[in-house]
Each structure stands twice: as structure tokens, then as C-alpha cells.
């Protein structure tokens, strides 16, 4: 192909692209945008409470050193006509007030007939709030995200549905309900978590935690004590001192257990403990079609009781087994290095497996 032909083809391609882009722009309906902003400030003391209830947008909080809560709400509507966009703006009602010791920001939507163009109307309602870091908060957000600062020093109650929570640490108690979103928070002192259908839940260090986790995957770094009910979701804890759990239809992995672990039900699940420290007190697991895998330092002194193992597998390997016995063909007992300290109690309910191996 000579240079003249190549140039002609390039010009032809450019013409086609111009025609196509023009056709698209002619076919696209113009979009009208309407905006509204509401702002209000309130003097507060540290015994006051901030309460919000928003939807179809985000709630973003920042901290400052003033004894004041400043709330700014941005509403934006997009529609095929200016009248439709304005009608959408008019549908939104924002109530900002202080009553007693509670500063509140509440979103409500008036009922409105949109005709046949409902699918072409879009709007967002975003809260931007500045407040003292030690103020207590009660936040509710649907169809949007909650964004909090790095350090939150007031008691916190948070509900987020169909959106994400992004936050730093909580030095006071945290009560969280999260559904159909992701959760990313840093360290907590005391937390109660109600989680459902969350894609990923990430928590830093936790001193004490109660968690009801369903259809969600949760990752925790270091945890002092946890009370956990986990169903249809995987859980990973890097380090745990003490735990009380129910694990169903899940995969659970704990990097290390320092003190004790009690699992009232390990059902159709696998629990793996990568390191049970040498001075552990006890591990109690009641399994139903479950698998327990534990690694313990080879020089640790402890006992193992694996009971109701009729159709189950058991493996104890790599240790100095100083004594072992079997009762009724289904109950098996081991003493490791004299069996002087901790104890592993496993009820296999006939169909569950246990594997205990030595860490060199």
C-alpha cells in the first residue's frame, strides 16, 4: 500500500468516527442539573450526641477543636429537564436541629409521581459534618457510604446498609450494623458487630469483640477476646488470646491462640489454628461434620481427648507421646510430654476429623 492510499484510508476512518460521534451526540438527550446546599451549626458540649439519618449519598465526618457541630448538606439532581430536576430537589427534605442534648440531621423524601421518566432521574444527598472527636455519634446511612476520621473518641452507634464504612480507630465502645457493603476499620477497644452479606470486613486490633457474622468474610489482626457466631462466611484472625465461637458452613483460620478457645459448634466447617502456644490452657471443640487442624510446639506438655470418633479420622504426629489409650473403640486419649499443662477436648460426633501436629 502506497502513501497516498494509506492517507486516503486514514481520512476515511476519521470521517466515519466524526459522523458516529455526531450521531451519538444528536441521539443523546440533554441533561439538566440542579443543586441545593443547606448549612447549619450548633454549639455542643462533650455530653451531647450527634444523630444522623441519610440515604442516597454519603456521610463524611471530620474532626476539629471547636465545641461546635457544623453540618453542610449538598443535594444534586439530574434529569432530562430542568423542571424534573427541580422537582427532585423539592422532594428532598433535610431537618437540621438541636433538641436537648441531641444534634440531628434527618433526610426524608416526599412522595411524588415521576410519570414515565423515573429511570432518567438521579440524585445524591451528601452530608459533610465537622465535630469534636470525643462527641458521641449515632449514624444511619442507606444506599451510600459513611466515612470517618482516623481516630474516633466518642461512643459510636453506626448502621450502614447498601454502602461501605471506612473509619479509623474507636477508643470508646462501637456498635455496628452493616449489611450489603464493605467494612474497613482500624483498632477498637470494645465492639459489637452485626454483619450480613458484607463482601469484606477488615478490623485492626480489638481488645474485646462480639460479632454475629453471616455471609461475610472477616479479617481481624490481633484480638484479646472474641465472642463470634459465624455462618456462611470465612474468618481470619492473626492473633487471639481467648475466644468463644460457633462456626457453621465456613472456613476459619487463626494464626495463633494464646490462652483458650471454646467452639460450641463446628458444623460443616474447617478450623485451622496455625500455632497454639505452648502455655495454652484449653481448646474445646464440639464438631459436626467439621475438621479441626492444630499445630502446637513440639516441646509443649498437654493432653488430647478425641471422643465419639466412630467414622472420623484422628492424627497426632511429631510429638513425644508419653501415654495413650482408647475406650470403646471411639474415644482416644493422649498425653504429650507428660500432659502437665493444657488440654485439647474434641467431640467428633462420629463424623468429624482432628489433626494435631508438632511445630519444630
Segments from the language model and where they lie:
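Intrinsically disordered, low-complexity terminal regions
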Residues: 1-360
Amino acid at each position: 500500500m502506497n502513501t497516498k492510499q494509506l492517507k486516503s484510508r486514514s481520512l476515511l476512518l476519521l470521517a466515519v468516527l466524526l459522523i458516529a460521534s455526531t450521531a451519538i451526540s444528536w441521539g443523546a438527550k440533554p441533561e439538566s442539573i440542579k443543586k441545593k446546599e443547606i448549612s447549619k451549626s450548633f454549639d455542643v458540649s462533650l455530653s451531647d450526641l450527634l444523630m444522623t439519618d441519610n440515604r442516597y449519598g454519603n456521610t463524611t465526618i471530620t474532626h476539629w477543636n471547636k465545641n461546635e457541630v457544623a453540618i453542610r448538606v449538598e443535594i444534586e439532581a439530574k434529569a432530562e429537564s430542568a423542571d424534573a430536576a427541580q422537582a427532585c430537589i423539592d422532594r428532598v427534605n433535610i431537618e437540621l436541629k438541636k433538641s436537648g442534648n441531641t444534634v440531628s440531621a434527618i433526610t426524608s423524601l416526599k412522595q411524588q409521581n415521576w410519570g414515565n421518566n423515573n429511570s432518567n432521574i438521579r440524585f445524591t444527598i451528601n452530608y459533610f459534618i465537622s465535630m469534636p472527636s470525643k462527641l458521641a455519634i449515632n449514624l444511619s446511612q442507606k444506599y451510600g457510604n459513611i466515612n470517618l476520621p482516623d481516630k474516633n473518641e466518642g461512643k459510636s452507634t453506626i448502621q450502614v446498609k447498601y454502602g461501605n464504612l471506612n473509619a479509623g480507630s474507636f477508643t470508646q465502645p462501637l456498635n455496628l450494623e452493616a449489611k450489603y457493603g464493605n467494612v474497613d476499620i482500624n483498632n477498637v477497644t470494645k465492639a459489637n458487630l452485626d454483619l450480613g452479606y458484607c463482601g469484606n470486613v477488615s478490623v485492626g486490633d480489638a481488645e474485646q469483640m462480639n460479632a454475629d457474622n453471616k455471609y461475610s468474610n472477616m479479617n481481624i489482626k490481633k484480638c484479646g477476646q472474641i465472642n463470634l457466631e459465624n455462618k456462611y462466611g470465612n474468618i481470619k484472625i492473626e492473633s487471639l488470646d481467648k475466644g468463644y465461637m460457633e462456626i457453621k458452613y465456613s472456613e476459619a483460620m487463626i494464626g495463633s491462640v494464646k490462652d483458650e478457645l471454646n467452639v460450641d459448634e463446628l458444623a460443616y466447617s474447617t478450623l485451622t489454628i496455625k500455632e497454639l502456644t505452648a502455655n495454652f490452657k484449653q481448646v474445646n471443640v464440639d464438631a459436626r461434620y467439621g475438621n479441626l487442624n492444630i499445630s502446637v510446639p513440639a516441646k509443649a506438655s498437654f493432653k488430647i481427648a478425641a471422643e465419639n470418633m466412630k467414622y472420623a479420622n484422628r492424627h497426632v504426629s511429631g510429638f513425644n507421646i508419653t501415654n495413650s489409650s482408647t475406650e470403646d473403640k471411639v474415644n482416644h486419649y493422649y498425653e504429650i510430654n507428660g500432659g502437665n499443662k493444657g488440654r485439647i477436648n474434641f467431640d467428633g460426633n462420629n463424623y468429624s476429623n482432628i489433626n494435631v501436629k508438632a511445630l519444630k
